[in-house]
């Protein structure tokens, strides 16, 4: 049965709606600065903006973070590297509901031990029962369990800690469990709010702290995209290596001797033997094929401060075109400065015959007291500058005189018409 026109249009619309791999998407863990037992798990493509929403600086906070007695909130850890919004939401739900998630191995789960709690300050175990959902130890244990699962352990994710006490709980838990994380999962520490006063801590939290320094755009692969555009401009002659995605994936997996994986994490280029990350390559390809708007935004030049919005590059180039200025530009410069360019080169060997050089421009050279003196070292030159109206009248007279000279020269040249031809 042939597809209908409506189904074809739906397929076309769905292809147009396909977006490139997002530049950044993460799952985060919030902790109340007032009550450390209050924790929250969420996901966002912009952690700094989302943190401002939770703290009430922007609209759009979650219902559980609206209570003023729990604000401000701090972002203590994030898990980034998701290739889509759906993948981040899937991991977020599994982190929030680890017990009912199909990716968690509950048989060998050490979280089920009752009374297991680790103090963030000392790093020692605390006796007594605690609510699994509000315990920091339980949340980090769930995170460790998901990252060891067969499903999420293949993902190119990265765990980043912004708080030293939370990272201490994480390290203590690693010593209590037998399972280890995959070598491809990186754990990074980025402490900036520890070892400072409470006032400085609140100021950093108001500005999102170290969370605001995260690169949530495509700036990290800007040079990569620019290089690919430069090499692919000439479609007939490409000097770099080209291969199918399936062939390149097989080449990367062959180097690692891995039969269970279908998508590699990284590999070696067969041409230059350089290290290539699969996520970076796929992000560049999807950005080049599906994200033309993102590419234009990435290479858009920022307008300089103080430059009018409607001023283009053409008007800027016109400022420095040539060394000279037009007549209108020179007049405008003279009116704005109020000064004339005076040539003080003497007309003869006598330095006091400068009247002939500057007399046409309205300058008067004289000695102090109006008397001539034999001592040249005591002589001074005083220039009387013209006012703009006088200068304009003088310029008009000068132009009239020039036009008169040109007419007279033309008349004199016409006298050759009456000349006799001598044979």
UniProtKB/Swiss-Prot annotation:
It is found in: Nucleus. The keyword Nucleus applies. Residues 23-105 form the GIY-YIG domain. Its main location: nucleus. Catalytic subunit of the SLX1-SLX4 structure-specific endonuclease that resolves DNA secondary structures generated during DNA repair and recombination. Has endonuclease activity towards branched DNA substrates, introducing single-strand cuts in duplex DNA close to junctions with ss-DNA. Belongs to the SLX1 family. This is Structure-specific endonuclease subunit SLX1. It comes from Paracoccidioides brasiliensis (strain Pb03).
């Amino acid at each position: 049965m042939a597809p209908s026109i409506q189904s074809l249009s739906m397929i076309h619309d769905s292809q147009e709606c396909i977006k490139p791999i997002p530049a950044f998407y993460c799952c985060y863990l919030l902790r109340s600065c007032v009550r450390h037992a209050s924790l929250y798990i969420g996901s966002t493509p912009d952690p700094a903006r989302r943190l401002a929403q939770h703290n009430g600086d922007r609209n759009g906070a979650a219902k559980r973070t609206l209570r003023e007695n729990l604000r401000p909130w701090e972002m203590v850890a994030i898990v980034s590297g998701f290739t889509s919004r759906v993948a981040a939401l899937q991991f977020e739900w599994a982190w929030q509901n680890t017990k009912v998630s199909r990716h968690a191995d509950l048989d060998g789960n050490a979280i089920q031990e009752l009374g297991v709690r680790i103090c963030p300050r000392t790093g020692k175990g605390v006796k007594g029962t605690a609510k699994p959902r509000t315990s920091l130890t339980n949340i980090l244990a769930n995170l460790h369990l998901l990252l060891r699962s067969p499903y999420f352990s293949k993902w190119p994710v990265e765990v980043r800690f912004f708080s030293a006490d939370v990272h201490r709980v994480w390290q203590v838990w690693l010593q209590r469990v037998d399972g280890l994380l995959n070598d491809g999962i990186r754990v990074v520490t980025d402490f900036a709010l520890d070892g400072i006063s409470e006032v400085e801590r609140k100021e950093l939290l108001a500005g999102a702290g170290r969370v605001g320094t995260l690169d949530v755009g495509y700036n990290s692969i800007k040079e990569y995209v620019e290089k690919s555009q430069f090499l692919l401009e000439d479609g007939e002659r490409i000097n770099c290596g080209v291969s199918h995605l399936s062939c390149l994936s097989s080449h990367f997996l062959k180097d690692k001797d891995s039969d269970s994986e279908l998508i590699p994490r990284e590999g070696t280029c067969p041409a230059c033997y350089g290290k290539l990350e699969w996520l970076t390559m796929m992000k560049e390809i999807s950005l080049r094929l599906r994200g033309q708007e993102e590419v234009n935004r990435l290479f858009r030049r920022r307008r300089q401060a103080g430059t009018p919005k409607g001023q283009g590059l053409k008007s800027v180039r016109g400022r420095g075109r040539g060394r000279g200025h037009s007549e209108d530009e020179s007049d405008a410069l003279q009116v704005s400065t109020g000064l004339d360019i005076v040539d003080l080169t003497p007309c003869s060997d006598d330095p006091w015959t400068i009247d002939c050089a500057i007399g046409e421009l309205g300058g008067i050279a004289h000695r102090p007291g109006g008397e001539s003196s034999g001592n040249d070292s005591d002589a001074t030159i005083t220039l009387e500058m013209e006012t703009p109206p006088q200068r304009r009248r003088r310029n008009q007279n000068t132009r009239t005189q020039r036009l008169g000279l040109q007419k007279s020269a033309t008349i004199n040249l016409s006298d050759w018409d009456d000349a006799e031809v001598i044979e």
